[in-house]
Regions:
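Residue-level detector of Asp-centered blade-edge/turn motifs that repeat once per structural unit
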Residues: 43-47, 98-101, 148-152, 204-206
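Beta-strand-rich domains and repeat architectures in extracellular enzymes and scaffolds
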Residues: 2-13, 23-66
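Blade-loop segments of beta-propeller domains
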Residues: 56-57, 63-109, 115, 131-135
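Short loop/turn segments that connect beta-strands within beta-propeller blades
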Residues: 72-77, 120-126, 181-185
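Surface loop/turn motifs at the tips and blade-to-blade linkers of beta-strand repeat domains
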Residues: 28-34, 83-89, 130-139, 168-169, ...
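Beta-rich catalytic cores
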Residues: 36-37, 64, 90-92, 113, ...
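Asp-box/WD-like beta-propeller blade repeats and closely related beta-sheet repeat scaffolds
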Residues: 106-153, 159-165
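Residue position within the beta-strands of beta-propeller blades
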Residues: 50-54, 103-107, 156-158, 210-213
Length: 231
């Protein structure tokens, strides 16, 4: 493990309570075969493990893929280790969050597999199940990130990056933010003013939801400073 200089930008003094007086960054693990650490970052305190999703890469069969990994964090007496998790059950996984006794992933989907919210067990053999994949019959584009309100509702973003990157069908929905109630199975579009809604999080009192709009860069790699890059 290697220490690097502190690189924390603090905009709220309360953050210092979490950082302590001398925060530092520590490299736990690195992997050079593919970009293994990209999204999710779901930490399970009970097992001291982190579930992450890779960035896209082409596997040995030449297919576009995303790999889910489980990181056992380790401590001073043992190094962090990585285990590749079977990822076929969550097609092109991206953002994730703690949910029940496992992880709720945003799956971007493929030409043949649905984009949607997938629940995956945190224990081997890591079975997964689909919660929702459409808005009143119209398939989601390529779900990106997710957060859960204390009332149990699930909020998530759905940009069209999958289509732009060539692995999802033509979109049938705008770039929108949704609220899903897993009890009633009700689904509502909450916002549709974004170019490419991406990250999502609630304020501590849950009265405000923060959403990043990464419209500045599109899925084909094109960048335009006239497009939003905002929160």
């Amino acid at each position: 493990m290697a220490d690097t200089p502190s690189a924390f930008a603090v905009f709220d003094e309360r953050f210092h309570r979490l950082l302590g007086p001398s925060p530092s960054l520590e490299l736990l693990l690195e992997h050079h075969d593919y970009p293994f650490a990209h999204e999710a970052g779901v930490y399970l305190p009970s097992t001291d493990e982190i579930f992450i999703t890779s960035n896209q890469f082409f596997n040995s069969s030449g297919q576009r893929s995303i790999q889910i990994s489980k990181i056992s964090v380790g401590d001073g007496s043992r190094k962090a280790t990585r285990e590749e998790i079977p990822s076929d059950g969550v097609p092109m996984a991206n953002g994730g969050i703690n949910y029940k006794n496992g992880i709720l992933f945003c799956a971007q989907g493929s030409e043949t597999q649905a984009s949607g919210l997938y629940y995956m067990s945190s224990s081997s053999p890591y079975p997964s199940s689909l919660l929702i994949s459409s808005f009143y019959g119209r398939p989601f584009n390529s779900l990106n990130d997710v957060v859960i309100h204390s009332d149990g509702s699930i909020w998530f973003t759905d940009p069209i990056y999958g289509y732009e990157q060539g692995y999802r069908p033509k979109p049938e929905l705008p770039n929108q933010v949704y609220r899903y109630d897993p009890v009633t199975k009700g689904i509502r579009a909450m916002a549709d003013v974004f170019g490419r809604p991406n990250g999502i999080a609630f304020s501590p009192d849950e009265k405000t939801v923060y959403i990043t709009d990464t419209d500045w860069i599109h899925g084909d790699g094109s960048m335009d400073g006239m497009r939003p890059s905002t929160m």
